[in-house]
Curated annotation (Swiss-Prot):
Belongs to the aconitase/IPM isomerase family. LeuC type 2 subfamily. This is 3-isopropylmalate dehydratase large subunit. It comes from Geobacter metallireducens (strain ATCC 53774 / DSM 7210 / GS-15). Its cofactor is [4Fe-4S] cluster. [4Fe-4S] cluster binds at residues 308, 368, 371. NCBIfam families: hacA_fam, IPMI_arch, PRK00402.1. The gene is leuC. InterPro entries: Acnase/IPM_dHydase_lsu_aba_1/3, Acoase/IPM_deHydtase_lsu_aba, Aconitase_4Fe-4S_BS, Aconitase_4Fe-4S_dom, HAcnase/IPMdehydase_lsu_prok, Homoacnase/IPMdehydase_lsu, IPM_dehydratase_rel_enz, IPMI_cat. Pathway: Amino-acid biosynthesis; L-leucine biosynthesis; L-leucine from 3-methyl-2-oxobutanoate: step 2/4.
């Protein structure tokens, strides 16, 4: 019987199986940021275990509130900064070099097919786009990962999600994943690996695949996974070209991590994306979604473009194409947060930042701040934000605020009209 990608990764990284169905895995990468890691650091220090298993396998960044907005966030940042220096963690990114973790670390080439990756952040599932097993963990698991380089997981069960057809005009990876979450529900993939397959995924860029995998957690998934292919090789080639004689050789190795044709899945779901419209959330759960035709015209106060879901260069290009030569509605605040310094620089070089600023957007440094209502775009009570982020929980972007999740294209059209708007008329 064949194996899924997740099963192959578990088998190759297995260290121990202390209980039936529980597997302890060796970790390839442990990621850290300043919101959750200081709690783990403090506990390890209190226990007299201020050590790291391998400083070369730890990647750390200050990204959620940066630069620090007050004494509390400055203290959190300092704790991570001091810890990284104390343990000679080379891959630490401080103010001026930092970006949103789930965009920055792939951009640096840190994730490879077949890797095991953890972080004290639920959207760690993003990195499954590379054919890795990547999962968010709690403080205790993060501590063990930092100290010993292992983590315990339940036996993986995978749901295969076949995305068939062709993406219509104005429909993007964000619309697809919102639709899938709407079909599954927020608990529909709990403790499962969501394996994204089919011609639609095959045709996607790595950026779009990361958008898909990023929101696996919104359906309860432990991780999202895409099959490594030549798209993966091309993305990683600048980092691996000295390791392989050719791209074909890299592809041959990467392909060993692909699910076998006779792999067994808990469920197999088929979706035809050809019939999709742009999708928007309407309530306080990510599975509360509507096609644009049923929600267009709803007013918003703010439009936010950015985050680990949609703050990449591809996303900025999509939005800028719609915004070029136009102004955002006077009733709306537009905020753009490019996800990394490189994305910011590349967007500047392409003239995208000029387009956003001329349209009336405020452009911030790379940060997660607005997404979780901590800085650079917090909502007031009663305000509504059209956002390219991944969570629309009550108060997520500010106490008493409401969030409509949507694609960069839909958010750009919404900014122009001041109400939720169909981007297809601008394409």
């Amino acid at each position: 019987m064949g194996k899924t990608t997740a099963e192959k990764i578990f088998a190759s990284h297995l260290v121990d199986e202390p209980f039936s169905g529980t597997k302890v895995l060796r970790l390839d990468v442990v990621m850290c940021h300043e919101i959750t890691t200081p709690i783990a650091i403090a506990d390890l220090m209190a226990r007299g275990k201020d050590r790291v298993f391998d400083p070369t396998k730890i990647k750390a960044v200050i990204d959620h509130v940066t630069p620090s907005k007050d004494s509390k966030t400055a203290t959190q940042a300092k704790m991570l900064r001091d810890w990284a220096r104390r343990h000679a963690i080379k891959d630490f990114f401080d103010v001026g070099h930092n970006g949103v973790c789930h965009a920055l670390f792939p951009e640096k080439g840190y994730i490879r097919p077949g890797y095991t990756v953890i972080m004290g952040d639920s959207h760690t599932c993003t990195h499954g786009a590379f054919g890795a097993f990547a999962a968010g963990v709690g403080t205790t698991d993060l501590e063990v990962g930092i100290l010993k380089g292992v983590c315990a997981f339940r036996e993986p069960k995978s749901i295969r999600i076949n995305l068939n057809g062709t993406l219509p005009k104005g429909v993007y990876a964000k619309d697809v994943i919102l639709y899938v979450i709407g079909q599954l529900g927020v608990n529909g993939a709990t403790d499962r690996v969501m394996e994204f397959r089919g011609p639609v995924v095959d045709a996607m860029t790595m950026e779009s695949r990361m958008t898909l995998c990023n929101m696996a957690i919104e359906a309860g998934g432990t991780s999202g996974i895409c099959m490594p292919d030549m798209v993966t090789v091309e993305y990683l080639w600048p980092f691996i070209e000295n390791e392989y004689p050719s791209k074909e050789a890299a592809l041959a190795e990467f392909s060993t991590w692909r699910s076998d044709d006779d792999a067994v899945y808990e469920r197999v779901l088929d979706f035809d994306v050809s019939v999709l419209e742009p999708i928007v959330t309407f309530g306080y759960k990510p599975d509360q979604v509507k096609p644009i035709s049923e929600i267009a015209g709803s007013p918003v106060d703010q439009v936010y473009l950015g985050s680990c879901t949609n703050g990449r260069l591809e996303d900025l290009r999509i939005a800028a194409r719609i915004l070029k030569g136009k102004k955002i509605a006077p009733s709306v605040r537009g905020i753009l947060s490019p996800a990394t310094p490189k994305i910011y620089k590349d967007a500047m070089a392409e003239g995208l930042i000029d387009i956003f600023m001329e349209a009336g957007f405020c452009v911030t440094n790379p940060t997660c701040g607005a997404c979780l209502g901590m800085s650079n775009g917090v909502l007031a009570e009663g305000e509504v934000c059209a956002s390219t982020t991944n969570r629309n929980f009550m108060g997520r972007m500010g106490k008493g605020g409401m969030v409509h999740l949507m694609s960069p294209a839909t958010s750009a059209a919404t900014a122009i009209e001041g109400v939720i708007a169909d981007p297809r008329k601008y394409l």
